Amino acid sequence: MRKYEVLYIIRPEVDEEARKALVERFNKVLTDNGGTVEKTTEMGKRRFAYEINDMREGFYVLLNVTAEPAATKELDRLMKISDDIVRLMITKDEK
């Protein structure tokens, strides 16, 4: 198992309840595929450096996870399908 950092941005117009459900859904994808979510940091709404798809801000979420590459690949696939995710980045944590 490897350590990963997952940073994703949720559309700003998603309400708080739906946003929390979305975070839980993506955490569950990782745990269902044998990974563990060590830390979830909701960084809040932030302004973008440049406009993305006619949006100027988004809600940032950072996950620190331990998982197999297949679990992160499945998470990446599901996040790319979701209309509520503006951007995502999954990186190996080398610590």
UniProtKB/Swiss-Prot annotation:
This is Small ribosomal subunit protein bS6. InterPro entries: Ribosomal_bS6, Ribosomal_bS6_sf, Ribosomal_S6_plastid/chlpt, Transl_elong_EF1B/ribsomal_bS6. PANTHER family: MITOCHONDRIAL 28S RIBOSOMAL PROTEIN S6 (PTHR21011), SMALL RIBOSOMAL SUBUNIT PROTEIN BS6M (PTHR21011:SF1). The gene is rpsF. The keyword Lyase does not apply. Binds together with bS18 to 16S ribosomal RNA. It comes from Exiguobacterium sibiricum (strain DSM 17290 / CCUG 55495 / CIP 109462 / JCM 13490 / 255-15). One of its GO terms (cellular component) is ribosome. It comes from the Bacteria.
